[in-house]
Amino acid sequence: MARFLVVLKPGVPLAAAAMLEALQPVLEGLRAEIEHRTPAHLSAMIRGGGESQRMQLFADVQSKTDGKVLELVLLSREAMGTTAPQTREVFKLMLELIQQHVPSMPLTFRSDRDGPLPTGA
């Protein structure tokens, strides 16, 4: 199962709902369908070319000692042993969309570059 994680940290304190709302252009760019949403969490489905290429995106606002962060997890059934090429492409697109549309929340961690979990997780 493929799993990619990114952590975003707002430059100024934001409410959880505002952090999730800032993701709207990213969700639209990924053509993600929101399945469940609360003030601090959302889950969405991203459909590729069939059931085997279906991906899930989870966004969770987490309280840390130095403030709130937004964690985004992209999951698919694609095998990581094959480097999960389709999931990796969606992950790269997600990173581009975040950089383009969410500059107020800089990326502080990405699992493909920094390891499986953030330090202190």
PLM regions and their residue ranges:
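Ser/Thr-rich, low-complexity intrinsically disordered terminal regions
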Residues: 1-121
